[in-house]
Protein backbone atom coordinates (compact mmCIF):
# COMPACT_ATOMS: atom_id res chain seq x y z
CA UNK A 1 0.00 0.00 0.00
CA UNK A 2 1.20 3.51 -0.83
CA UNK A 3 0.14 6.41 1.40
CA UNK A 4 1.86 9.45 -0.01
CA UNK A 5 2.38 13.19 0.32
CA UNK A 6 3.99 15.28 -2.44
CA UNK A 7 5.86 18.39 -1.30
CA UNK A 8 7.03 21.23 -3.51
CA UNK A 9 6.68 24.96 -4.07
CA UNK A 10 4.00 26.37 -6.42
CA UNK A 11 4.95 25.57 -10.02
CA UNK A 12 7.02 22.51 -9.09
CA UNK A 13 4.64 20.19 -10.94
CA UNK A 14 2.88 18.45 -8.06
CA UNK A 15 -0.48 18.43 -9.88
CA UNK A 16 0.89 16.77 -13.02
CA UNK A 17 2.86 14.23 -10.99
CA UNK A 18 -0.21 13.45 -8.84
CA UNK A 19 -2.29 12.62 -11.93
CA UNK A 20 0.35 10.17 -13.21
CA UNK A 21 0.70 8.51 -9.78
CA UNK A 22 -3.08 8.14 -9.35
CA UNK A 23 -3.39 6.66 -12.88
CA UNK A 24 -0.71 4.04 -12.30
CA UNK A 25 -1.29 3.10 -8.67
CA UNK A 26 -5.08 3.70 -8.41
CA UNK A 27 -4.71 5.75 -5.24
CA UNK A 28 -7.44 7.94 -3.78
CA UNK A 29 -6.48 11.55 -4.63
CA UNK A 30 -7.40 13.56 -1.55
CA UNK A 31 -7.49 17.31 -2.11
CA UNK A 32 -8.32 19.51 0.88
CA UNK A 33 -10.06 22.01 -1.43
CA UNK A 34 -12.36 19.28 -2.79
CA UNK A 35 -12.96 17.95 0.74
CA UNK A 36 -14.09 21.35 2.02
CA UNK A 37 -16.42 21.89 -0.95
CA UNK A 38 -17.94 18.40 -0.64
CA UNK A 39 -18.39 18.52 3.15
CA UNK A 40 -20.02 21.96 2.97
CA UNK A 41 -22.29 20.95 0.08
CA UNK A 42 -23.37 17.80 1.98
CA UNK A 43 -23.76 19.86 5.18
CA UNK A 44 -21.88 17.32 7.31
CA UNK A 45 -21.23 18.46 10.92
CA UNK A 46 -17.55 19.13 10.15
CA UNK A 47 -18.48 20.77 6.84
CA UNK A 48 -20.86 23.16 8.62
CA UNK A 49 -18.20 23.90 11.23
CA UNK A 50 -15.69 24.74 8.48
CA UNK A 51 -18.32 26.86 6.67
CA UNK A 52 -18.93 28.95 9.81
CA UNK A 53 -15.26 30.08 9.68
CA UNK A 54 -15.10 30.54 5.90
CA UNK A 55 -18.31 32.63 5.84
CA UNK A 56 -16.73 35.06 8.30
CA UNK A 57 -13.57 35.26 6.19
CA UNK A 58 -11.51 33.43 8.82
CA UNK A 59 -9.00 30.63 8.36
CA UNK A 60 -10.33 27.17 9.22
CA UNK A 61 -8.50 25.95 12.38
CA UNK A 62 -6.09 23.03 11.95
CA UNK A 63 -8.22 20.79 14.19
CA UNK A 64 -11.28 21.24 11.95
CA UNK A 65 -9.26 20.54 8.78
CA UNK A 66 -7.79 17.46 10.50
CA UNK A 67 -11.31 16.21 11.29
CA UNK A 68 -12.21 16.54 7.61
CA UNK A 69 -9.07 14.65 6.57
CA UNK A 70 -9.87 11.88 9.06
CA UNK A 71 -13.43 11.57 7.70
CA UNK A 72 -12.06 11.35 4.17
CA UNK A 73 -9.42 8.74 5.06
CA UNK A 74 -12.16 6.50 6.47
CA UNK A 75 -13.78 6.24 3.01
CA UNK A 76 -13.49 2.81 1.30
CA UNK A 77 -11.63 4.18 -1.76
CA UNK A 78 -8.53 4.76 0.42
CA UNK A 79 -8.04 1.04 1.12
CA UNK A 80 -5.48 0.71 -1.73
CA UNK A 81 -3.66 3.85 -0.59
CA UNK A 82 -3.95 7.61 -0.98
CA UNK A 83 -2.12 10.72 -2.09
CA UNK A 84 -2.70 13.86 -0.01
CA UNK A 85 -2.88 17.21 -1.78
CA UNK A 86 -2.84 20.47 0.22
CA UNK A 87 -2.41 18.89 3.66
CA UNK A 88 -0.31 19.09 5.75
CA UNK A 89 1.04 22.59 5.18
CA UNK A 90 2.69 23.04 8.60
CA UNK A 91 4.43 20.83 11.15
CA UNK A 92 1.43 21.25 13.48
CA UNK A 93 -0.79 19.79 10.74
CA UNK A 94 1.81 17.06 10.13
CA UNK A 95 1.60 16.04 13.80
CA UNK A 96 -2.21 15.99 13.62
CA UNK A 97 -1.99 13.83 10.49
CA UNK A 98 0.39 11.45 12.24
CA UNK A 99 -2.18 10.97 15.03
CA UNK A 100 -4.93 10.32 12.46
CA UNK A 101 -2.94 7.78 10.43
CA UNK A 102 -1.99 5.92 13.63
CA UNK A 103 -5.63 5.77 14.74
CA UNK A 104 -6.77 4.51 11.34
CA UNK A 105 -3.73 2.22 10.94
CA UNK A 106 -2.90 3.87 7.61
CA UNK A 107 0.65 5.17 8.15
CA UNK A 108 2.37 7.37 5.58
CA UNK A 109 4.74 5.30 3.46
CA UNK A 110 6.34 8.07 1.40
CA UNK A 111 6.84 11.82 1.34
CA UNK A 112 8.36 12.98 -1.95
CA UNK A 113 9.67 16.52 -2.43
CA UNK A 114 9.82 17.83 -6.00
CA UNK A 115 12.79 20.21 -6.09
CA UNK A 116 12.96 23.08 -8.56
CA UNK A 117 15.31 26.07 -8.40
CA UNK A 118 13.54 29.28 -7.40
CA UNK A 119 14.57 31.13 -10.58
CA UNK A 120 13.02 28.37 -12.70
CA UNK A 121 9.80 28.54 -10.65
CA UNK A 122 9.60 32.32 -11.09
CA UNK A 123 10.02 31.88 -14.87
CA UNK A 124 7.37 29.14 -14.97
CA UNK A 125 4.83 30.98 -12.84
CA UNK A 126 5.30 34.41 -14.40
CA UNK A 127 5.07 33.07 -17.97
CA UNK A 128 1.25 32.95 -17.89
CA UNK A 129 -0.65 35.38 -20.12
CA UNK A 130 -4.34 35.76 -20.92
CA UNK A 131 -6.29 36.82 -24.01
CA UNK A 132 -8.10 40.12 -23.32
CA UNK A 133 -10.93 39.25 -25.69
CA UNK A 134 -11.93 35.70 -24.62
CA UNK A 135 -9.94 34.94 -21.43
CA UNK A 136 -8.02 31.95 -22.87
CA UNK A 137 -4.93 31.26 -20.73
CA UNK A 138 -1.47 30.50 -22.14
CA UNK A 139 2.04 29.94 -20.81
CA UNK A 140 5.08 31.16 -22.74
CA UNK A 141 7.07 28.11 -21.66
CA UNK A 142 4.65 25.19 -21.53
CA UNK A 143 1.61 26.27 -23.55
CA UNK A 144 2.24 29.18 -25.95
CA UNK A 145 -0.19 30.28 -28.69
CA UNK A 146 0.24 28.31 -31.94
CA UNK A 147 0.85 31.56 -33.82
CA UNK A 148 2.84 34.13 -31.87
CA UNK A 149 0.67 37.06 -30.77
CA UNK A 150 -2.62 35.48 -31.91
CA UNK A 151 -5.11 33.75 -29.61
CA UNK A 152 -5.81 30.16 -30.72
CA UNK A 153 -9.42 30.42 -29.59
CA UNK A 154 -10.69 33.77 -30.85
CA UNK A 155 -7.88 35.20 -33.01
CA UNK A 156 -7.45 38.19 -30.68
CA UNK A 157 -4.09 39.99 -30.53
CA UNK A 158 -4.21 41.64 -27.11
CA UNK A 159 -3.01 39.81 -24.02
CA UNK A 160 -2.50 40.74 -20.38
CA UNK A 161 -0.86 39.31 -17.28
CA UNK A 162 -2.64 38.98 -13.93
CA UNK A 163 -1.14 40.97 -11.04
CA UNK A 164 -0.36 37.80 -9.05
CA UNK A 165 1.55 36.31 -12.01
CA UNK A 166 4.05 39.18 -12.12
CA UNK A 167 7.61 38.13 -11.16
CA UNK A 168 7.86 40.26 -7.98
CA UNK A 169 4.50 38.93 -6.69
CA UNK A 170 5.45 35.35 -7.61
CA UNK A 171 8.74 35.77 -5.71
CA UNK A 172 6.89 36.84 -2.55
CA UNK A 173 4.47 33.92 -2.91
CA UNK A 174 7.38 31.49 -3.17
CA UNK A 175 9.05 32.98 -0.08
CA UNK A 176 5.87 32.49 1.98
CA UNK A 177 5.55 28.89 0.76
CA UNK A 178 9.23 28.15 1.36
CA UNK A 179 8.90 29.20 5.01
CA UNK A 180 6.19 26.55 5.46
CA UNK A 181 7.79 23.91 3.23
CA UNK A 182 11.25 23.76 4.81
CA UNK A 183 10.14 22.74 8.35
CA UNK A 184 7.81 20.12 6.81
CA UNK A 185 10.70 18.59 4.87
CA UNK A 186 12.81 18.52 8.03
CA UNK A 187 9.93 16.88 9.93
CA UNK A 188 9.61 14.03 7.42
CA UNK A 189 13.36 13.69 6.94
CA UNK A 190 13.65 12.97 10.67
CA UNK A 191 10.95 10.29 10.22
CA UNK A 192 13.09 8.68 7.50
CA UNK A 193 10.37 8.73 4.81
CA UNK A 194 11.43 11.77 2.73
CA UNK A 195 12.76 11.33 -0.82
CA UNK A 196 13.56 14.06 -3.35
CA UNK A 197 13.31 14.24 -7.14
CA UNK A 198 14.55 16.84 -9.60
CA UNK A 199 11.50 18.75 -10.86
CA UNK A 200 13.42 20.59 -13.59
CA UNK A 201 13.16 17.56 -15.87
CA UNK A 202 10.27 16.78 -18.23
CA UNK A 203 7.04 15.69 -16.47
CA UNK A 204 7.60 12.17 -17.86
CA UNK A 205 11.09 11.97 -16.33
CA UNK A 206 9.86 13.38 -13.00
CA UNK A 207 7.21 10.65 -12.87
CA UNK A 208 9.78 8.01 -13.83
CA UNK A 209 11.93 9.03 -10.84
CA UNK A 210 8.90 9.04 -8.50
CA UNK A 211 7.85 5.64 -9.86
CA UNK A 212 11.29 4.21 -9.01
CA UNK A 213 10.92 5.43 -5.41
CA UNK A 214 7.40 4.02 -5.05
CA UNK A 215 8.31 0.70 -6.70
CA UNK A 216 11.15 0.17 -4.21
CA UNK A 217 8.78 0.03 -1.24
From Swiss-Prot:
Compartments in which it is found: Cytoplasm
Main enzyme class: transferase
Region (LID): 127-165
InterPro entries, alphabetized: Adenyl_kin_sub, Adenylat/UMP-CMP_kin, Adenylat_kinase_CS, Adenylate_kinase_lid-dom, P-loop_NTPase
Binding sites annotated in the UniProt record for ATP: 11-16, 128, 137-138, 201
Binding of Zn(2+), residues: 131, 134, 151, 154
The record's note on its domains: Consists of three domains, a large central CORE domain and two small peripheral domains, NMPbind and LID, which undergo movements during catalysis. The LID domain closes over the site of phosphoryl transfer upon ATP binding. Assembling and dissambling the active center during each catalytic cycle provides an effective means to prevent ATP hydrolysis. Some bacteria have evolved a zinc-coordinating structure that stabilizes the LID domain.
Family: Belongs to the adenylate kinase family.
Entry-linked PANTHER family: NUCLEOTIDE KINASE (PTHR23359)
Protein name (Swiss-Prot/TrEMBL): Adenylate kinase
Organism: Lactobacillus johnsonii (strain CNCM I-12250 / La1 / NCC 533)
Amino acid sequence: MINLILLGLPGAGKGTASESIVDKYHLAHISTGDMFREAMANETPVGLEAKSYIDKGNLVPDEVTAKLVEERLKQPDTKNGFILDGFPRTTVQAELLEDITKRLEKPLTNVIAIDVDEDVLIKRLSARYICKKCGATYNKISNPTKVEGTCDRCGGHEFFQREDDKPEVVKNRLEVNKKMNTPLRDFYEEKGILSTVNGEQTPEKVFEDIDKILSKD
